[in-house]
Amino acid sequence: MFDVVISDIEAREILDSRGYPTLCVKVITNTGTFGEACVPSGASTGIKEALELRDKDPKRYQGKGVLQAISNVEKVLMPALQGFSVFDQITADAIMIDADGTPNKEKLGANAILGVSLALAKAAANTLQRPLYRYLGGSFSHVLPCPMMNLINGGMHATNGLQFQEFMIRPISAPSLTEAVRMGAEVFNALKKILQNRQLATGVGDEGGFAPNLASNAEALDLLLTAIETAGFTPREDISLALDCAASSFYNTQDKTYDGKSYADQVGILAELCEHYPIDSIEDGLAEEDFEGWKLLSETLGDRVQLVGDDLFVTNSALIAEGIAQGLANAVLIKPNQIGTLTETAEAIRLATIQGYATILSHRSGETEDTTIADLAVAFNTGQIKTGSLSRSERIAKYNRLMAIEEEMGPEALFQDSNPFSKA
């Protein structure tokens, strides 16, 4: 068993949920076992994320092809890894990082490297005939995460004029992951009927949430409260609200304002929303470059609301350490494709957890049927996950995988929300 090595690595171009190309990578061992992984892609991206390599050939997919990334997998990474143990994830990831040789993986592409990294872990798990979460986390991995369900899409994930990007619900009173999914689905369908009755659009955005034309962020939150109550649940007690402001998308870097408002105004807006609505989590409430704004937000709300850094940290351990030292945020969003390897993803989770920051495993707006992040959330006991709404198969696939894991674990499974400010 211990001489199972990488014999081949294949990559192919597939489409993500937005109809853009991405990679599917297959790592094959000398025993015939293999693992496959598909790489997601973001629309709202942090400026310090690892680079997603695109061909920039206007004759194919408006320049978004990934043939060069595929070539890098097969002609650079495969020869570099061929013959190495399928179980030595850390060494394999280090070899790929060295082969790239750039701080943001711009030479070979984080999409190429991540595809190999995740497929390698799956190949190892399949070789041992273990589920991925158990292979990576061992016997101590038993926490099923509380989902953040994106029911109304705005910002860069829709074309409806809403300033904030995600308006989410968190089923905090659920006794299990399966019940949390049921609660979310019932609120989702209640919201759909409410929108229909008000003659509002029920088309969905990139992450499966509805994207109606609304006048304000508050109107979106009011709709969520109505849907929660219509579905038979009590806001705050059963289901809380969460926001992803994606504030960098409406931040003016020249005059350092948010749609003409100062960072103090932006913090005031968020504080007022938290007074009027059962919000217990806010992601990217300030722009990634606005450290003064983040400091004020953390001082103002950090003792009663989960403040999640996404663009602020981009799953980068160095940036997380810097933010912790400055007292910015109190939670970290974890997106494997922001950093580019499984090893670095695990390091980011470990660092945040040691420092008392909550972690949330997250999808991207451009997703595939790949369910790896569900296993990662359980493997690393993150206690929270963001994987979209209760529609679109690329989102539902992750929920279905989590429910399967919960059933497989039986009484060992523990549904646990890692948000310390949860009202449940």
From Swiss-Prot:
Q: Does the keyword RNA-binding apply?
A: no
As for subcellular location, the record says: Cytoplasm; Secreted; Cell surface
Cite a GO CC annotation.
extracellular region
Going by the UniProt record, its keywords in alphabetical order are:
Cytoplasm, Glycolysis, Lyase, Magnesium, Metal-binding, Secreted
List of residues binding Mg(2+): 244, 283, 310
GO MF? magnesium ion binding; phosphopyruvate hydratase activity
Cofactor note text: Binds a second Mg(2+) ion via substrate during catalysis.
Give me any GO biological process, just one.
glycolytic process
> Enzyme group, top EC level?
lyase
Cofactor(s) recorded in Swiss-Prot or TrEMBL: Mg(2+)
Q: In which pathway does it act?
A: Carbohydrate degradation; glycolysis; pyruvate from D-glyceraldehyde 3-phosphate: step 4/5
- What is the active site of this protein? 207, 335
Give the reactions, separated by semicolons, that this protein catalyses: (2R)-2-phosphoglycerate = phosphoenolpyruvate + H2O
Q: Which InterPro entries match?
A: Enolase (IPR000941), Enolase-like_C_sf (IPR036849), Enolase-like_N (IPR029017), Enolase_C (IPR020810), Enolase_CS (IPR020809), Enolase_N (IPR020811)
Q: Which residues bind (2R)-2-phosphoglycerate?
A: 165, 335, 364-365, 386
What is known about what this protein does?
Catalyzes the reversible conversion of 2-phosphoglycerate (2-PG) into phosphoenolpyruvate (PEP). It is essential for the degradation of carbohydrates via glycolysis.
| Family that this chain belongs to | Belongs to the enolase family.
Q: Give the matching HAMAP family.
A: Enolase
Name of the protein described by the UniProt record: Enolase
Which organism encodes this protein? Chlamydia trachomatis serovar D (strain ATCC VR-885 / DSM 19411 / UW-3/Cx)
Upper lineage is: Bacteria, Pseudomonadati, Chlamydiota, Chlamydiia, Chlamydiales
Q: Gene for this protein?
A: eno
